[in-house]
Every structure is written in C-alpha cells, then in structure tokens.
Amino acid sequence: GRVELDGFHTSQLDARTRAQKIAVVQQESSMLFPLRAWEYVLQGRHPYGRTFHFESEEDFTIVENALEQVGASPLAERWMDKISGGEKQRVVVARALAQQPLLLLLDEPTLHLDIGAQVELLERLRRLAAENHYTVVVVTHELNMAAAFADQVVLLHKGKCLKVGPPAEVYRRELLEQVFEAPLDVEFGPDGRPRVSIRGRKEIGLGSDPAQPA
C-alpha cells in the first residue's frame, strides 16, 4: 500500500518536507544536554531553517503559541531535566506543534499525566486539530479516552487491523476481549459513545476476594 498526505506520496517527500508536514511525539524523549522548555520547543522549527539562518521573531512567536496551546507557558524558562514527567510531556507535544504539521503522530501522549491532565491535553489537541485543519493520530491503550475523543478508531491485534470506524462501531465486547484478553463490558452513554469496564469478579467466576470477608 501507500500513504498520501496533502496529495503527495509520503515516500516521495524529501526529509525536510516530510519533517514540515509530519510531527511525531514518542513515548520517551531523551536529550543530549539540558535545555529550557522554550529552547526545546524551538527545535520544532528546525525543518524550516536554512544554512547560516538564525531563528526569526516568527519562530519565537510560534514557540510561545505552541507552549500556550498545551497549557505549558509557565514552564517556558524551566529546565527540562527539572520538571515532572507530565510537564515534560506537555512540552514535548508543544515542540511537535511548533513544526506546524499537517499530520501529528503521538505514541501514548497521556502516559505520564493524571486523569485531569489527560482530559485537558486531549481536549486541546482535538480543538487545535479542528481549528488548524490537521490530523491527529494517537496510539493508546486508554480505551475510554479514545472512545471519548476519537472520530475514528483503528483496533489492532498482533499486527493486524481488526476493525476501523467510529468508536460506537468498533467497541464490541467480543473484539475488545479478543485483543485485551480480559473480561470486559461495553456500555453506551447518552451521547452514543461507548465506555469500557472490567466485568465483575462474580460474573466471571472468581467469587469474592479471598482477602476480604464475603
């Protein structure tokens, strides 16, 4: 198969153009030397640089906006090795936004965030995608977060695609149990979006918890 982005085959794009159109946020991001948050986000402007080219005022404005978009403006002057994992994740996402991509790929972007921060980040990404007309693809094991925010879900199992579609179509108990190998229940809220929970112990034949009185 082939992948097209903005009318171009991605395999035919040179490295610089590909970096301008596609941004990636990995699970873990390492640094060779300490940087302040704004300096780290400024690296997202690298695909637009030229030989002997210094950062422009536009670059700094884009960095400032990217930090603001993920709620990380207060971290701008903080050193990356001195902030928490959740704060660092926000800054890493801001660097990707500074690339101003058409396609944003995120691998477990909520990994180090508490539940409130997860919701806030995903709400921001959904709003930004709508406002800026770019596509966000998120790899996640957070079933309920995916159901709450995704327009389309791709359910993968052992390297194969089992089903693609809106969460309400993809979230079928038998499919989810096949993938996650756990007894699950799927319920649908008033908005039609599914919610997944683990089936009760007694329902799956485990009885009461031996550590607790019956």
Spell out what each predicted region is.
Residues H53, W79-I83, E87:
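Conserved ABC ATPase signature
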Residues L104-E108:
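Catalytic Walker B motif of ABC-type/P-loop ATPase nucleotide-binding domains
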Residues Q100:
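Conserved catalytic motifs of ABC-family nucleotide-binding domains
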Residues V179-A214:
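ABC ATPase nucleotide-binding domains
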Residues G1-H9, R18:
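Conserved ABC transporter NBD signature motif
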Residues L42, E57-L75:
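Conserved ABC ATPase "signature" region
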